[in-house]
Amino acid sequence: MTLVYQSTRDANNTVTASQAILQGLATDGGLFTPVTYPKVDLDFDKIKDASYQEVAKLVLSAFLDDFTAEELDYCINNAYDSKFDTPAIAPLVKLDGQYNLELFHGSTIAFKDMALSILPYFMTTAAKKHGLESKIVILTATSGDTGKAAMAGFADVPGTEIIVFYPKDGVSKVQELQMTTQTGDNTHVIAIDGNFDDAQTNVKHMFNDVALREKLAANKLQFSSANSMNIGRLVPQIVYYVYAYAQLVKSGEIVAGDKVNFTVPTGNFGNILAAFYAKQIGLPVGKLICASNDNNVLTDFFKTRVYDKKREFKVTTSPSMDILVSSNLERLIFHLLGNDAVKTAELMNALSTQGQYELIDFDAAILELFAAEYATEEETAAEIKRVYQTDAYIEDPHTAVASAVYRKYQAATGDATKTVIASTASPYKFPVVAVEAVTGKVGLTDFEALAQLHDISGVAVPPAVDGLETAPVRHKTTVAAADMQAAVEAYLGL
């Protein structure tokens, strides 16, 4: 039986996996979400010796069950290849009291590569499957990492255009240059005068604009998304949680069946939601620890059941988590409400019109899986320094948020369960923050800090940032948030 993906806002809006990948977002504003979970044979005595590609085949074939085995092999083998700098793809590193799952070994040194390396293959395969003649326009808002990873994946892919919006003053210099120097005739990068929430809200509006959709269709164009709102982004992230567990079994750190906690630095809620889905297919998960920075709207939600975006937006040293409207939480809300699309739509409407909602009647067992805490800027910097002093290992600021939150959780609960930290970016993506935290040196440029980071860590400067300082800047457009749609129409000649 083919797995059904339903809009979180309309029970009658159902599609297959390949259709969901092509559409990106549901036309009613909801997110396509599984209403049942596939059966996956998680026999870790066998899986522990499997390659990353083999684990990917096991998980993806269950969730994307309208793709053939041959189609999935094509997608997997083209995605997880020499673009990654280690055959392990996502190695697990043992530190003092925790395990860091390194998700930054792809071409843009951030965890988004794990899914965005395969999404273009999913999308072009799905387009062929459905005889799609329209050009696919990938429309994406980024808080720093998705934009570059999406462009790296889709650059010069036939039948696609990609347009990325980012907050002009809301990303690191390295992140910005990674985007603005991107090559590819089909890539377009636009800075906005506003924050990530402004960018994401306007992208959603464009997806839901009926008149714009009709204009696109008349020109043989169709929007899709590379954000984690697209199920094709989310499902590949389930793979690395299963793979991490298999590595723990293989190394003898745990016995198959032992529960493991995962601590995930969280902004748009996609990464931790993938861990939740891993639990639903049988991964022995104890707690999912949701780690936030000073934009702690999710921490408050899990503690009070009230989601309130009416608060100051703070620019932090972990910019990929500087988000007040966490889009993927909608999928968890849908599950918490027993997959009730009417109730979910009501709450999302309340968030849009009143800036908040309260969760009242919900599945307590699901919520019980989650713990939540946040780390301040000072705590994040202190954690980078502590981990370096303890393990001679440098974490990026997002990973350090998760690491600091895990230590808070452990102190509060005494929970001794083995815990994996999702290490979501290389410190080379945020060199100034890392070097300042470790050495106390201030006032360095990003490129001075890159050299210092190499000296301190002994880790080679990754190709993703090596030479970035002298790379030609190709994308120089900045627009007001209100002018985003006009910019899209101009690029597409509408």
Which residues are covered by each model-predicted region?
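PLP-dependent amino-acid enzyme catalytic core
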Residues: 1-494
